[in-house]
Structure formats: structure tokens, C-alpha cells
Amino acid sequence: MTEQKRKLEKLTGVKGMNDILPQDAGLWEFFEATVKSLLRAYGYQNIRTPIVEHTQLFTRGIGEVTDIVEKEMYSFVDALNGENLTLRPENTAAVVRAAIEHNMLYDGPKRLWYLGPMFRHERPQRGRYRQFHQVGVEALGFAGPDADAEIIMMCQRLWDDLGLTGIKLEINSLGLAEERAAHRVELIKYLEQHVDKLDDDAQRRLYTNPLRVLDTKNPALQEIVRNAPQLIDFLGDVSRAHFDGLQRLLKANNLPFTINPRLVRGLDYYNLTVFEWVTDKLGAQGTVAAGGRYDPLIEQLGGKPTAACGWAMGVERILELLKEEHLVPEQEGVDVYVVHQGDAAREQAFIVAERLRDTGLDVILHCSADGAGASFKSQMKRADASGAAFAVIFGEDEVANGTVSVKPLRGTGAEGEKNVQQSVPVESLTEFLINAMVATAEDGDD
């Protein structure tokens, strides 16, 4: 292959890492604005951590025998200093690391939220990507079931704000460490009785992470799993009181839930409450949000013993649901598209476009694609395609007379007439456009 041909080859993105194109950006912005407004209403503060962390953060935090650490992390050795680094597969461990490093809990509990890309090396499919986005909350320093209930109810409010339906809540308790240890012994004994029927994945986990066997999706193992010892039967008084307290709060707020004794989550840092929000509208990838309590994690990562809970949700999956339920908002166009013909008109158009932006209007100023001036007809086609509400037109006559022509592209003009082009003095343009937009909005409300 020649060098010239190599240069002409079309490059594509990495499989499972998707571009967010302009036609989709409006949906992302709608979701982000909705979730940010919700999180502010609950008193949460934004935190932003690097996408690259020391690998040890995740092996210590998530657990060395979890699927994420064993098979799914993008890890590499920094050629400059030999450090083992990893693209973050999740963000709870990183937020906790930041809270410890910057002594954020010295003056009491913190409510934090994040939004950003995560990375996992797995087979791309619908709702599961190698680069994906999560929004999450971390309530650090809160020990009671009231914090668990609040973050769960926060999710329900988000579904309501987005207009989503059919997302169901499942909850469970993983108890405390000594209760999980007692259950682990009995679970291994039980699974050993069926070892010849376990698939390779279950056999691999039998002695390293047997709790995860309960989460298998293999149809052939469902009866074995259904009859396995349940962790909820091993809960002591403290764990049971915490779980009962959570249920009472959810019931008091009329939030329906199902207790799923097989719900265990795939990260080692969880204890007590775990929960998932699930839907049947996304095929196999039915979990749209998940979380729980992770009281041991802060101490495990070098901080003082501190209670904590949180959740994370997959943004792409929620956007899929919005599309499925036809809840995608219409893309808003700009307010004004400025059309001009001739050098003098172009100079005047630049000045006026900036003045309009100074007043808060969104303005596109026509710029030539090939360096030559486009015809009025061509520019007006672009103005209409842009979604702008009005075209502001500068020609030789307008420049000579100190006026502009304003043409409504959607709705009505200032005088209530549809698509009627009017001549307006330049000094009155801003007032005219604002009045025209008010008239258009009122026309749309009728």
C-alpha cells in the first residue's frame, strides 16, 4: 500500500465508544439540565474527578475478584514513571478518594454528585458500551436508613421529571461483614452439592465470590439459585432494623418496591442496603440505576470509618428509554439568522449581530462556505434550515437607508401577520425582535 493511499484512508472511532452528534446533543442537554436541577433541589454539590486513576484505587475499592477488575478495566503502565493507571470503570471509588485526599469531611457530611464518562473493556451491545456515561450521587457521612430512602426517592422524582414510566424498584440487604461471612459458608456448601451443574462462570466464582453466583442470568441455573440460602435470613438485629426502617420510609412515601433476595450488586464495597431500578424495555440491559450503602469503603481507601451511600445511573440507557417512550424534546433553533449581500452589508451585519447577542438573543451570522458571497436565495434556505425564528436581512438598500428587513420564518411577526417581511430601522431592531418573539410565543400558546 502506498503512502499516499494510507493517508486517504478514512479513520473511524473505537468500537463501543460513540460520538454524540449535534442531532443527539439536544437530548443529552435536556437530560443533563433536568438532573442538575433535581440534584440542586436536594442540596447536592458537583464534584469532578480525573478519568484516569491509580489502578490500586479500583483493586482495593471495587475488589480484585470482581468482573470489573478481573476482565473489564482499561489499565496501562505510564511510560514516564512506571505507574499503573486505569481509565475509571466507575466513579464512587474516585469520589471517595478525592474526599479523603482533600479532607472534605472535616466539617461534617457531604452530598456530592458527578456526571461523566466511564470505561469498561467489554463486548459492545445495546445499552452497554466501552465508553459510557454515568450520573451519580454520593452521600458521605450519613449512616441511617433515611439517607438510603432519600437517594432512592430522588431517582423516582427524576423518572417523574423526565416523564418515564415502568421503571421498578428492587431492594435487598447485604447485611454486615460477619453476616455475609456466615452466609458465604452455607452458600458454598450448598453450591458444592450442585457443582457438576454449574457453568464455567459459576464454578470460577464458587470460592472467590460465591455471592455473585446468585446474580447469574443463565436459565439452566435458575432453579439452583432459587433454592440457595438467602442472605436476608442471616441478618442480625442491626441489619434487620436498618432494612425495616428503609421499607417503612418508602411505604410512607407511597414508593412501591419489591424485595429481591438475589440482588447482590457486582462491587465488593456494598453492605446493608442495595437497590436497582429496572425496566423490561431495554432487553437484557434492564438496569438503569443502581446503588446502595458502602460503609466500609472510606476506611478501606485510607480514611476514617465513615458511613456512606449512593447510586449511579447509565445516561445512555435512560436516553434510550426517552426515545422508546417518544419523550425526546424538540430541538430549539436560534432566534435570528443574519443574511447579507455585499461588503458594506457584511460589515454592518457583523456589528448588528454582536449587538443582538449583547441583549441575550441567539444569532447565527451567515458566513460563506467557499469565500465567495452566496445569493440571497441560498442564504435564506440556510436561514430556514437553521431553525431560526427570524431572518434579519442586510442588502445595499438597507445599508443606504439605515434599515434592515426582518422576515419571520416561523409563527407570526410583530404585527401578527405570518411570514410578512418588514423594514425596520437598525436602531429599533432589538425592540422589534423582542416584541415579535413575544407575539410568536403567544400565538403558539393559543
Curated annotation (Swiss-Prot):
Protein's UniProt name: Histidine--tRNA ligase
Catalytic activity: tRNA(His) + L-histidine + ATP = L-histidyl-tRNA(His) + AMP + diphosphate + H(+)
Domain of life: Bacteria
The family this protein is said to belong to: Belongs to the class-II aminoacyl-tRNA synthetase family.
UniProt keyword annotations, A-Z: Aminoacyl-tRNA synthetase, ATP-binding, Cytoplasm, Ligase, Nucleotide-binding, Protein biosynthesis
GO MF entries: ATP binding; histidine-tRNA ligase activity
GO cellular component: cytoplasm
UniProt cross-references to Gene3D superfamilies, sorted A to Z: Anticodon-binding domain (3.40.50.800), Bira Bifunctional Protein, Domain 2 (3.30.930.10)
Main location: cytoplasm
Subcellular location: Cytoplasm
Signal sequence residues: none
Native organism: Burkholderia pseudomallei (strain K96243)
Cell cycle in keyword set: no
SUPFAM superfamilies membership: Class II aaRS ABD-related, Class II aaRS and biotin synthetases
Subunit architecture: Homodimer.
Record HAMAP family: His_tRNA_synth
